[in-house]
């Protein structure tokens, strides 16, 4: 956001914001204000030696090429702005050995992760209160789409049980406080992006299947 009074922001027609971690090569260009179009659009760029270059297919770059047999990894079909892309959700769950359990999330809201952990413990019965839980969205991106909830809990449970999720599976679904998997919007676009990259199975909320 622009520092100080919002006078300058009111004067201009468009306000753009770059997001990204300095340790990663990818940057997201978001529209905070746009008098001539939607603020839901975004662009993904790659920082190279010769400058920024647009990423035409971010899904291919954000996924690990071979994670077969690796626990703690789940693939989600997310939508940021108007474009769908696949992201890799990584989780590591281990016994807390230094007193209070640690909770850490990179690229995902830590408060939402704590809520999902509470749902897993209260509604499903998984005992994670004495476990360290680390979550990472690969590529250094920050994702706010609630549809990746399902991949977050899948990655956490996969790591906790040390059981890998089949690499051909993609998913999308929002998790409610009662433990239900809630429907998400634009499911056709999400599935289409997964099919384009060769995923053979897609896990989605039951309600979303009615319109397919």
Model region roles, listed by residue range:
Residues 1-212:
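Peripheral, non-AAA+ core regions of ATP-driven protein-machinery
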């Amino acid at each position: 956001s622009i520092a100080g009074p919002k006078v300058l922001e009111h004067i201009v027609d468009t306000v753009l914001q770059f997001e990204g971690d300095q340790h990663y090569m990818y940057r997201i260009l978001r529209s905070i204000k746009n008098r001539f179009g939607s603020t839901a659009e975004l662009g993904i760029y790659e920082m190279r030696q010769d400058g920024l270059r647009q990423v035409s297919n971010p899904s291919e770059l954000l996924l690990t090429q071979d994670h077969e047999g690796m626990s703690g990894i789940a693939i989600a079909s997310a939508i940021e702005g108007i474009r769908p892309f696949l992201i890799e959700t990584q989780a590591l769950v281990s016994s807390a050995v230094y007193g209070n359990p640690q909770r850490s999330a990179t690229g995902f809201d830590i408060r939402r992760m704590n809520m999902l952990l509470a749902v897993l413990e209260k509604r499903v019965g998984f005992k994670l209160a004495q476990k360290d839980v680390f979550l990472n969205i690969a590529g250094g991106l920050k994702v706010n789409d609630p549809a990746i909830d399902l991949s977050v809990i899948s990655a956490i449970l996969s790591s906790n049980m040390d059981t890998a999720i089949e690499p051909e599976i993609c998913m999308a679904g929002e998790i409610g406080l009662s433990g239900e998997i809630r429907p998400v919007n634009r499911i056709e676009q999400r599935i289409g992006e997964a099919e384009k990259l060769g995923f053979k199975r897609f896990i989605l909320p039951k309600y979303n299947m009615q319109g397919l």
